[in-house]
Amino acid sequence: MTTISTDQVAAIARLARLAPDEAQLATFARQFGDILGYMEMLNGLDTTGVEPLYSPVQHATALRSDETAPRCTREDVLRNAPEADSEFFIVPRIV
């Protein structure tokens, strides 16, 4: 079974701008390990002769009519940003 350390989970959380506590890091590490173990099990399956699917169901997706809905204001959206000025998100420089 694949294991993932709490340090690896903390690094992933930092990238996602999350701040889990130590108990949550341990829980997430166990859950990530379970997920990766399941993926390893799926990788071990013999899929010879199985036709690839783009969807598990055979019917087409039903379309719905477009409807207008209330929108968030710029202030509402920027209020949830870790850092913003009056009009834009402020993000770390990448290059």
Swiss-Prot record:
EC number, UniProt record: 6.3.5.-
A Gene Ontology BP annotation from the UniProt entry: glutaminyl-tRNAGln biosynthesis via transamidation
GO molecular function: asparaginyl-tRNA synthase (glutamine-hydrolyzing) activity; ATP binding; glutaminyl-tRNA synthase (glutamine-hydrolyzing) activity
Catalysed reactions listed for this entry: L-glutamyl-tRNA(Gln) + L-glutamine + ATP + H2O = L-glutaminyl-tRNA(Gln) + L-glutamate + ADP + phosphate + H(+); L-aspartyl-tRNA(Asn) + L-glutamine + ATP + H2O = L-asparaginyl-tRNA(Asn) + L-glutamate + ADP + phosphate + 2 H(+)
Keyword ATP-binding: yes
SUPFAM superfamilies to which the protein is assigned, alphabetical: Glu-tRNAGln amidotransferase C subunit (SSF141000)
InterPro entries assigned to the protein according to its UniProt record, in alphabetical order: Asp/Glu-ADT_sf_sub_c (IPR036113), GatC (IPR003837)
Keyword terms: ATP-binding, Ligase, Nucleotide-binding, Protein biosynthesis
Record-annotated membrane-spanning stretches: none
Domain of life: Bacteria
Keyword Membrane part of the UniProt annotation: no
Pfam family membership, one: GatC
Family label: Belongs to the GatC family.
Role summary: Allows the formation of correctly charged Asn-tRNA(Asn) or Gln-tRNA(Gln) through the transamidation of misacylated Asp-tRNA(Asn) or Glu-tRNA(Gln) in organisms which lack either or both of asparaginyl-tRNA or glutaminyl-tRNA synthetases. The reaction takes place in the presence of glutamine and ATP through an activated phospho-Asp-tRNA(Asn) or phospho-Glu-tRNA(Gln).
Subunit relationships: Heterotrimer of A, B and C subunits.
PANTHER family: GLUTAMYL-TRNA(GLN) AMIDOTRANSFERASE SUBUNIT C, MITOCHONDRIAL
Name recorded for this polypeptide: Aspartyl/glutamyl-tRNA(Asn/Gln) amidotransferase subunit C
Lineage: Bacteria, Pseudomonadati, Thermodesulfobacteriota, Desulfovibrionia, Desulfovibrionales
